[in-house]
Amino acid sequence: MKSYLILNTLLLSLLKINGFSKSSWFSSKTSLIFDRINKLNDPQSSNSIHSRKYQYFQLKKFPNSTNVRCNDGSIPGYYTRPSTTNCSKKWLIFLEGGWYCFNNNTCESRRRTHYDLFSSEFWSSERQLGGILSNNERINPNFHDYNSVYIPYCSSDLWSGKQLEKTNGLYFHGSRILDTVVDDLTQNQHFKKVHEVAFVGSSAGGIGVLLNIDRLKRRLKKKLKRKVFIHGIVDSAWFLDYPAYRQSNCTHIYECPPENALRNGMKLWNPRIPRRCKKFQGRGREWKCFMGPVIYRHLKNPTFIIQSLFDDAQLQMSKVPILEGGSNKKFSYIQQLGGFAAQTLRQAKGVFAHSCVDHEILTKSNWAYVSVNNQRLHETLNYWQAYLEGEKKKIKKKVQKNPKLIKTGKSPCKNLRKPKFSGNIDQSKYQLIDSCHISQITSYKIQLPHNRTLSRCANAIPLIPLCNPTCSPLSHPISGLSMSFIDLLELYNVRINLIAKSLGISMEQLRKMNTQQQISLLYCSSR
């Protein structure tokens, strides 16, 4: 916009110097130049990707007559932003995350400290959202050209509540809100042409996807009277049924193990749990269906899992916040927890799991560029998309007997983005789980004093937080400075200085090495 103003001013100045005015000779041909510049740079221009229409999500609240409510009784709604490609028939529906509450105390605390997750009273009429909801191709290579829907979270029930009436003075309408959004979208003329819907969610929103995706597909089919290809992307919602490091009295949401919190929460929420999972788990164990490793095996629609092996929320619930530090025993527990997460994720058809300490990855501006084994997340999703294209073809073959289900007419759109890959894709390309393989690290040549060399290592070592060099750095709890892998070990009383001394190197030399070199040296060097 600034460049346009400068150009405009310069052109006008030059014309005035030469005796021309905007109303004379200039007004014929030269005015066309200014008109085009204005159109390209006008933030309200319908053809500009920078226009407000394509940059901001617009709020649509449900009418007062609707029978869905946020916790406090206010009317919920959702935000939409059209694709910059007017022809796009692909939609991304994002479910917001934000923990939950499970009794009167935790719900009251939520009302006081996170009111926007409790009520729609102060929701803005428009929002600019980033991460996987950005329309910037650099930030969001995979979904920047999708029509996008953002559903704010105000039910505190992991998107599961179905009871119409209040419970303890509060509404828990999570699954009912999703039904209402889907029903409202199917009245949208643009949405009626939809070919593909990606249900995406982070944290509590990811659990919402796992619990509702199959049911919402059935609802869409019924409303549109045809099949639509549905798939899911679940971020930071693979919570584990794993013994906590220490016991807790469960008075605070961040301190309560999943089983205790979910058992209590279900009494408030009256949740809608997928029938297949509920039946498989049996009476009294339905709470397990909120756990990623349990519900995933019952899903009918392809769902891609994105997870930090050392998920920050999981560490809190397991009583081992990473920056709290502690003993070697505690660090060993953290490693075992990460290893268990990796083991359970192997069942996922599509997965990207890095050994970082992170949570809600898709909402960050750098989400696409986190890597595992030198393959970035957005590249992994490209391979997954190629796999999905194969699944779409299977669906088309099944409905060919009824041409009305697939006939869409000639499309005026010739330049729609196509999948980057096609044909048979090696499954390992969209199943990436970090393992800190030493064999991938020892390619570094490290010069040690006294002719010391790297010994032959085992194929893998126990998982280590931050062993992935693309992890976002942690901030030291005291200094606030970015922490290296070495700093993290020192936080757990590992005497790095003694190890360095035994290897004949200084701490300064050790700190100058990158993460992979440090791991290789500390875990593989002969002493």
Curated annotation (Swiss-Prot):
What are the EC numbers?
Answer: 3.1.1.98
Q: Name one GO molecular function term.
A: palmitoleyl hydrolase activity
List the signal peptide residues: 1-19
Which leading EC class covers this enzyme? hydrolase
**Glycosylated residues in this chain:** 64, 86, 104, 249, 451
What chemistry does it catalyse, as a reaction equation? [Wnt protein]-O-(9Z)-hexadecenoyl-L-serine + H2O = [Wnt protein]-L-serine + (9Z)-hexadecenoate + H(+)
A Pfam family per the record: PAE
Family, as annotated: Belongs to the pectinacetylesterase family. Notum subfamily.
Job of this protein: Carboxylesterase that acts as a key negative regulator of the Wnt signaling pathway. Acts by specifically mediating depalmitoleoylation of WNT proteins. Serine palmitoleoylation of WNT proteins is required for efficient binding to frizzled receptors. Promotes head regeneration following amputation by inhibiting the Wnt signaling pathway.
Q: Does the keyword Transmembrane helix apply?
A: no
Gene Ontology biological process terms in this record = negative regulation of Wnt signaling pathway; protein depalmitoleylation; Wnt signaling pathway
Q: Where is the active site?
A: 203 (charge relay system), 311 (charge relay system), 359 (charge relay system)
* Expression across tissues: Expressed in the anterior pole.
Keywords in alphabetical order, please.
Answer: Glycoprotein, Hydrolase, Secreted, Serine esterase, Signal, Wnt signaling pathway
Is this entry keyworded Signal? yes
Domain of life here? Answer: Eukaryota
Q: Which factors induce or repress this protein, as stated in its UniProt record?
A: Strongly up-regulated near anterior-facing wounds following head and tail amputation.
Would you tell me the Gene Ontology cellular component terms? extracellular region
Protein name as it appears in the record: Palmitoleoyl-protein carboxylesterase NOTUM
Tell me the compartments it is located in: Secreted
